[in-house]
Amino acid sequence: MANGLNAGKKLMKSRKTYRWSDRDYKRRVLNLKKKSDPLEGAPQAKGIVIEKVGIEAKQPNSGIRKCVKIQLIKNGRQLSAFAPGDGAINYIDEHDEVVVEGIGGRMGRSKGDIPGVRYKVIKVNGISLHELVKGRKEKTVR
């Protein structure tokens, strides 16, 4: 490594080169998160429910976490989304239009004991899933 009064350019050049070894730098500069993200960088997205699935919780927990398989409207990509709340899966039917958002795991990944699920359902046919579970609102018949 050069050091001296006139070594600035060399130092800058070598920093620029070695910075590409940093995974986070590379992902940020090349916009890799946005390119691989099914939501394409948006906070929420609409989709159509394809099927209901039960995903088994990771060790040491046991139980079946109720999730839905969704096809996004804007790009046709498929993803799994968790249905939060007691009996929430009963308010979601196939071919319903749902709104999904990130589940809130660290670094945009899955949360807790639900493997491979990075999103959660927040609305069903334009009505908040939380309100449906609480019984404050009823699901409209389309």
Curated annotation (Swiss-Prot):
Instruction: Report which residue ranges the record marks as coiled coil.
Output: none
Any one annotated GO CC term = small ribosomal subunit
This protein's UniProt keywords? Ribonucleoprotein, Ribosomal protein, RNA-binding, rRNA-binding
Q: Which GO terms describe its biological process?
A: translation
TM spans, by residue?
A: none
Q: Offer an example of a GO molecular function term for this protein.
A: rRNA binding
Domain of life per record:
Archaea
Instruction: Offer one Pfam family short name for this entry.
Output: Ribosom_S12_S23
Do you know which PANTHER family this protein is assigned to? 30S RIBOSOMAL PROTEIN S12 FAMILY MEMBER
Family to which this protein belongs:
Belongs to the universal ribosomal protein uS12 family.
- Which proteins does it associate with, and in what oligomeric form? Part of the 30S ribosomal subunit.
Q: Matching NCBIfam families, A to Z? A: PRK04211.1, uS12_E_A
Q: Report the protein's function.
A: With S4 and S5 plays an important role in translational accuracy. Located at the interface of the 30S and 50S subunits.
This protein is called Small ribosomal subunit protein uS12
The protein's organism comes out as Picrophilus torridus (strain ATCC 700027 / DSM 9790 / JCM 10055 / NBRC 100828 / KAW 2/3)
